From Swiss-Prot:
Residues 50-59, 102-118, 151-167 have a biased composition (Basic and acidic residues). Residues 1-14 have a biased composition (Basic residues). Residues 60-69 have a biased composition (Acidic residues). Pfam families: PP28 (PF10252). It comes from Mus musculus. The modification Phosphothreonine is found at T18. This is 28 kDa heat- and acid-stable phosphoprotein.
Length: 181
């Protein structure tokens, strides 16, 4: 702990910004209260028609405030700072009556990419099985070379076996000829 105790207190947790709409609403409410007090002081009984007009004006002001709140309800510093981020998506809340359950469900980016990846893989496998991809062509060429090598090896084996059989037959003939003498 440094000398003199702790310095500084809470940094920014207690800061609260008032939105311009709230400030305007407070100013209008104060003006209306001041007007009402002035009118009450000036004419007590004869001002029965005026409060009705004031109530109408109050109702219209409240409806305007409600419209403003309905259009854009900003929290914290958002009301003070204009955000110009084109990538920012404003999430709008929908009522139950506005929900479209019958329409196609929009997939997230990851889900879409996963489906596209699977489709691309399936397309590639079909092309590969049909022998239309470069890898399939290379595989088929390699298989053809191996097939030729095996055929040649089988042919050589057959020739060697025939040669061996001929040698054994010729050897037996020699023996039989020598025995006949």
């Amino acid at each position: 702990m440094p000398k003199g105790g702790r310095k500084g207190g809470h940094k920014g947790r207690v800061r609260q910004y008032t939105s311009p709409e709230e400030i305007d609403a407070q100013l209008q409410a104060e003006k209306q209260k001041a007007n009402e007090e002035d009118e009450q002081e000036e004419g007590g009984d004869g001002a029965s028609g005026d409060p009705k007009k004031e109530k109408k004006s109050l109702d219209s002001d409240e409806s305007e405030d409600e419209d403003d709140d309905y259009q854009q309800k900003r929290k914290g510093v958002e009301g003070l700072i204009d955000i110009e981020n084109p990538n920012r998506v404003a999430q709008t809340t929908k009522k139950v009556t506005q929900l479209d359950l019958d329409g196609p469900k929009e997939l997230s980016r990851r889900e879409r990419e996963e489906i596209e990846k699977q489709k691309a893989k399936e397309r590639y496998m079909k092309m590969h099985l049909a022998g239309k991809t470069e890898q399939a062509k290379a595989d088929l060429a390699r298989l053809a070379i191996i097939r030729k090598q095996r055929e040649e090896a089988a042919r050589k084996k057959e020739e060697e076996r025939k040669a061996k059989d001929d040698a054994t037959l010729s050897g037996k003939r020699m023996q039989s000829l020598s025995l006949n003498k």
